Amino acid sequence: MASTLKFIVIVPAAGVGKRMQANCPKQYLRINNETILSHTVMRLLSHPLISQVIVALGTEDQYFAESELAHHKDIIRVNGGTERVNSVLNGLKAVDSDKYPWVLVHDAARPCVSHQDIDKLITRCLRKDYGGILATPVRDTMKRGVLIKDSAKGDNTIIESTVEREQLWHALTPQMYKTDELTLAIEQALENSLKITDEASAIEQANLPSLLVSASSENIKITHPNDLALAEFYLNKQANNTN
């Protein structure tokens, strides 16, 4: 793809990943003898248009300093926050928006993102001149549930209704926005105590548009223990395809 711009990516990595039930934060679990965080960050830095990665880490992180990433010249470390949105904002404050008018944000636990999908996202956002996210359309029938509390028989979640899936998408990362617009949108959302689950939700609250860019289903987020084997499979498959 043709672009004279270079890009910076923020990777919020301050979480502990309790659902993984591991002895260390999930981003430091290893696949093929390399941490998930290392797979993710090096995948990003190997893209020809990505110059730097900002990693937002927990203040009590004891693992990064011992990792292969600690002394990389193109990796910037910042302190993470209590929530993902706070970590992203801390990362944004370290970005020179004159040098990097656009910023991407990518989950630490998505090591399988492809260069092809990053290319698609960058190309579409630059062409339209507003931000967007990688996403996959929902394929399964979607149900809205409601919790029924029953002290005698136990609580149960039952189906309330079927949700039309035609316009529903799974939000993935990277998510790409103009640096100043995303910073302002997040700051305003936090000031108004709005719930922000990803960068796109902050942009939505600011009444700004976001593109949905269809991406590969291989771009999974490692959340549960059985995701590790699937991520390893995809990483090995991708490595074989490039050889």
From Swiss-Prot:
GO terms for biological process: isopentenyl diphosphate biosynthetic process, methylerythritol 4-phosphate pathway. SUPFAM superfamilies: Nucleotide-diphospho-sugar transferases. Keywords: Isoprene biosynthesis, Nucleotidyltransferase, Transferase. It is an enzyme of class 2 (transferase). Belongs to the IspD/TarI cytidylyltransferase family. IspD subfamily. Its EC number is 2.7.7.60. Pathway: Isoprenoid biosynthesis; isopentenyl diphosphate biosynthesis via DXP pathway; isopentenyl diphosphate from 1-deoxy-D-xylulose 5-phosphate: step 2/6. It catalyses: 2-C-methyl-D-erythritol 4-phosphate + CTP + H(+) = 4-CDP-2-C-methyl-D-erythritol + diphosphate. Catalyzes the formation of 4-diphosphocytidyl-2-C-methyl-D-erythritol from CTP and 2-C-methyl-D-erythritol 4-phosphate (MEP). The gene is ispD. It comes from the Bacteria. One of its GO terms (molecular function) is 2-C-methyl-D-erythritol 4-phosphate cytidylyltransferase activity. The record marks R19, K26 as: Transition state stabilizer. InterPro entries: IspD, IspD/TarI, IspD/TarI_cytidylyltransf_bact, ISPD_synthase_CS, Nucleotide-diphossugar_trans. This is 2-C-methyl-D-erythritol 4-phosphate cytidylyltransferase. The record marks R165, K221 as: Positions MEP for the nucleophilic attack.
